[in-house]
């Protein structure tokens, strides 16, 4: 809290979902899709008080007549006009607070381009007139939320996956690795392998159904080959799912074949290292003296790490890559879907953090580049 007990606003903008709320709370008040929709045909929505754009859940529910855009691709903001709309919606419709009365903590992807941080800073001060703001790296916030300041974070959301080694609260940029394989790709892959079973999901509405199947029924196998054999020889792994129209579908080995692609991207036709190898490669780019601390503090974060079995599998895979005497610990906090936001809530409510905010006055004196001096 600031001197006069005004709660800071914490906004975590993800590729798939935006999480927003008040510093000091233990969970975000608002979680909505990061999408902006515009009517495909002017005048189609007669008498609806024709709006020229819709954001979040409203865009989702009217998607039949809208063209949907995601302003954040692979974790990085690519469309600033739409991003501004999402922030406006966050402050005025979701949180219902005037941003000019609250400090705002925003999150950014690791390796976010410098120009992007400046643009975020500029929009907060010039468009929304925030009294103060700060930009924090997502993975660092997840680590804080787990009660650590040193460790490596595997952060996997809807649009991108990063491995971020952090030492004493600072991300080590030379060792950060990015993998363009995340939740959206897994949903696409699941719809593809369900097609092989004869179930077709093509429209955006049906994509949402596949995402729900993924979230409710998929899991990571400890031993993929063995699990495939079990699935082939018995029906013990089969589960049924009721579609909105009442039809019931059965899903078997798809349950673990879908998230297996995190460990074997070749299943998606991608020639890249899996999340376990990427984590290992990231650790190997760090100074030899801190590797031990990273192996022992490997923290999972983001919605795509929510699959049951993922921590055990990571433990197994990293153990086989690392030196045999190394102590390896994978930390998978139950609230990891929102741990970036939670870390932001913790950070922004610390009394020691209050001097870290970029104030409107500092911005007016130095311009957008102030963000590089104050936020690192």
Swiss-Prot record:
GO CC term, one of those recorded: cytoplasm
Compartments reported by the entry: Cytoplasm, Cytoskeleton
Lineage, broadest ranks: Eukaryota, Metazoa, Spiralia, Lophotrochozoa, Mollusca
UniProt name for this protein: Actin, muscle
Family in the record: Belongs to the actin family.
Subunit structure: Polymerization of globular actin (G-actin) leads to a structural filament (F-actin) in the form of a two-stranded helix. Each actin can bind to 4 others.
Name of the top EC class for this enzyme: hydrolase
EC numbers, comma separated: 3.6.4.-
SUPFAM superfamilies linked to this entry: Actin-like ATPase domain
Primary location group: cytoplasm
Record's keyword terms, sorted: Acetylation, ATP-binding, Cytoplasm, Cytoskeleton, Hydrolase, Muscle protein, Nucleotide-binding
Tissue and organ expression note: Expressed in the muscular cells of the sheath surrounding abdominal ganglions.
Function field: Actins are highly conserved proteins that are involved in various types of cell motility and are ubiquitously expressed in all eukaryotic cells.
UniProt entry tagged with the keyword Glycosyltransferase: no
InterPro entries on file: Actin (IPR004000), Actin/actin-like_CS (IPR020902), Actin_CS (IPR004001), ATPase_NBD (IPR043129)
Catalytically driven reaction(s): ATP + H2O = ADP + phosphate + H(+)
Positions carrying N-acetylaspartate: 3
Protein source organism: Aplysia californica
CDD domains noted in UniProt: ASKHA_NBD_actin
Gene3D superfamilies: 3.30.420.40, Actin, Chain A, domain 4 (3.90.640.10)
Propeptide: 1-2
Molecular function terms from GO: ATP binding; hydrolase activity
């Amino acid at each position: 809290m600031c001197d006069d007990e005004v709660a800071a606003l914490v906004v975590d903008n993800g590729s798939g979902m935006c999480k927003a709320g008040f510093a000091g709370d233990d969970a975000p008040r608002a979680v909505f899709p990061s999408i902006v929709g515009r009517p495909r045909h002017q005048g189609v929505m007669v008498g609806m008080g024709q709006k020229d754009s819709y954001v979040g859940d409203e865009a989702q529910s009217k998607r039949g007549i809208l063209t949907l855009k995601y302003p954040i691709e692979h974790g990085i903001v690519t469309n600033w006009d739409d991003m501004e709309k999402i922030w406006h919606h966050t402050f005025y419709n979701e949180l219902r607070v005037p941003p000019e009365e609250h400090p705002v903590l925003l999150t950014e992807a690791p390796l976010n381009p410098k120009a992007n941080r400046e643009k975020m800073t500029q929009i907060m001060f010039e468009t929304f007139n925030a009294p103060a703001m700060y930009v924090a790296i997502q993975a660092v916030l997840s680590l804080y939320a787990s009660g650590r300041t040193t460790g490596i974070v595997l952060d996997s959301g809807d649009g991108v996956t990063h491995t971020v080694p952090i030492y004493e609260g600072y991300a080590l940029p030379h060792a950060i690795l990015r993998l363009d394989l995340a939740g959206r790709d897994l949903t696409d892959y699941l719809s593809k392998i369900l097609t092989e079973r004869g179930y077709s999901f093509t429209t955006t509405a049906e994509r949402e159904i596949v995402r729900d199947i993924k979230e409710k029924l998929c899991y990571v196998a400890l031993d993929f080959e063995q699990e495939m054999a079990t699935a082939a020889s018995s029906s013990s792994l089969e589960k049924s799912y009721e579609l909105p129209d009442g039809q019931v579908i059965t899903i078997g080995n798809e349950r673990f074949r879908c998230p297996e692609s995190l460990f074997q991207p070749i299943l998606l036709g991608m020639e890249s290292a899996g999340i376990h190898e990427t984590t290992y490669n990231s650790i190997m780019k760090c100074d030899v003296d801190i590797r031990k601390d990273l192996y022992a503090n490997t923290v999972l974060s983001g919605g795509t790490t929510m699959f049951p079995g993922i921590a055990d599998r990571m433990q197994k895979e990293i153990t086989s890559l690392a030196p045999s005497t190394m102590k390896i610990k994978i930390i998978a906090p139950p609230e990891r879907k929102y741990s970036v936001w939670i870390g932001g809530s913790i950070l922004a409510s610390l009394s020691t953090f209050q001097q870290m905010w970029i104030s409107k006055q500092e911005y007016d004196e130095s311009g957008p580049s102030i963000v590089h001096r104050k936020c690192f």
